[in-house]
């Protein structure tokens, strides 16, 4: 009579062998970990600390860049223009954010053929604070002016971010293009400081919808600004992925072949004026100008003598050349004002 085949014996022996091997491996691994921590624990701890600080700084970058609450009432009160035709409009971005716009209407001679300026402001306050500047644009340039509050600013919803601001600019341009009472061939972008980066990016993505661009006291990029403001720390060696907000205007300006005006206040104590000159030099536009105001500060260059004369000359001469730019051969002359 055959003996019954028993599986348990070999299986038990196999399990015991595996357990014994695993225990030995665990002891060796534990010893290796102890030795590694003893030898390199300081480096590991330093790495963890640096990683934590990097994460905090990455999240903290928005606080250093966006100031929608300055002045303190900026999120509660948006001054409206008085005594002039205007519309207070709300639009939606593609990601569903509700934005607040002010449209200042030019009602002088031939209003249907007037240019329309899309005004992108800096990193603080709201569109109401820019109304006095925008009214002077309307009067001197005989143009409609559309001011938009980015997400998280003024009465607009959401929180500011680089991609969010780009979407806000696109939504504003889309809205203007839907209006039958606006000449779609004469849409001009204007941006000051951070708004200059937004305007340059919008122009680079919409070369056939933007007739011209004007930027004032803006920067090459946020990494360039970080290297300038924090010169005591080797910020220039940080890779781009360390920056949550980049605003790489020195790259975005390269596709912008439409007529371009670069406005630089040489008394700007925040953004080095040399950055405006570098953006001007990077621009491939055959019809570009660099308007220089020696007494112009970061926020108040528009109050300098001759400021609106420079803008008016640009609007009259260079905007007309936009229609011929596709067929004109050679390089147009460049004027430095």
From Swiss-Prot:
Its main location: membrane. The keyword Hydrolase applies. One of its GO terms (cellular component) is membrane. Glycans are attached at residue 299. Its EC number is 3.-.-.-. The chain crosses the membrane at residues 30-50. GO terms for molecular function: palmitoyl-(protein) hydrolase activity. It holds the Pfam family Abhydrolase_1. InterPro entries: AB_hydrolase_1, AB_hydrolase_fold. It comes from the Eukaryota. It is a single-pass type II membrane protein. The active site is at residues 193, 268, 298. The keyword Hydrolase applies. It is found in: Membrane. Keywords: Glycoprotein, Hydrolase, Membrane, Signal-anchor, Transmembrane, Transmembrane helix. Belongs to the serine esterase family. This is Protein ABHD13. The lineage of its organism: Eukaryota, Metazoa, Chordata, Craniata, Vertebrata.
């Amino acid at each position: 009579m055959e003996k019954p085949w028993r599986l348990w014996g070999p299986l038990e022996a196999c399990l015991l062998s595996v357990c014994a091997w695993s225990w030995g491996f665990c002891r060796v691994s534990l010893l290796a970990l102890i030795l590694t921590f003893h030898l390199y624990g300081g480096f590991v701890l330093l790495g963890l600390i640096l990683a934590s600080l990097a994460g905090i700084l990455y999240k903290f970058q928005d606080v250093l860049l966006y100031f929608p609450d300055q002045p303190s009432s900026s999120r509660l009160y948006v001054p409206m223009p008085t005594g002039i035709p205007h519309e207070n409009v709300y639009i939606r971005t593609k990601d569903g954010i509700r934005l607040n716009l002010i449209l200042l209407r030019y009602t002088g001679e031939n209003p249907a053929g007037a240019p329309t300026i899309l005004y992108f402001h800096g990193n603080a306050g709201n569109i109401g604070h820019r109304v006095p500047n925008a009214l002077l644009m309307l009067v001197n340039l005989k143009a409609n002016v559309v001011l938009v509050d980015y997400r998280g600013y003024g009465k607009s919803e959401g929180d500011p971010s680089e991609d969010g601001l780009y979407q806000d600019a696109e939504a504003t341009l889309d809205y203007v293009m839907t209006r039958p009472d606006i000449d779609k061939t004469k849409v001009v972008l204007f941006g000051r400081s951070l708004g200059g980066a937004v305007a340059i990016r919008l122009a680079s993505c919409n070369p056939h919808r933007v007739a011209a661009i004007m930027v004032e006291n803006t920067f090459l990029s946020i990494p360039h600004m970080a290297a300038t403001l924090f010169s005591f720390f080797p910020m220039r060696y940080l890779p781009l992925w360390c920056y949550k907000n980049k605003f790489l205007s020195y790259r975005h300006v390269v596709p912008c072949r439409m007529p371009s005006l670069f406005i630089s206040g040489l008394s700007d104590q925040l953004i080095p004026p040399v950055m405006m000159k570098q953006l001007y030099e990077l621009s491939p536009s055959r019809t570009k100008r660099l308007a220089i105001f020696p007494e112009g500060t970061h926020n108040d260059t528009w109050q300098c003598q001759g400021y609106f004369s420079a803008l008016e000359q640009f609007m009259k001469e260079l905007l007309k050349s936009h229609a011929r730019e596709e067929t004109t051969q050679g390089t147009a002359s460049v004027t430095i004002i």
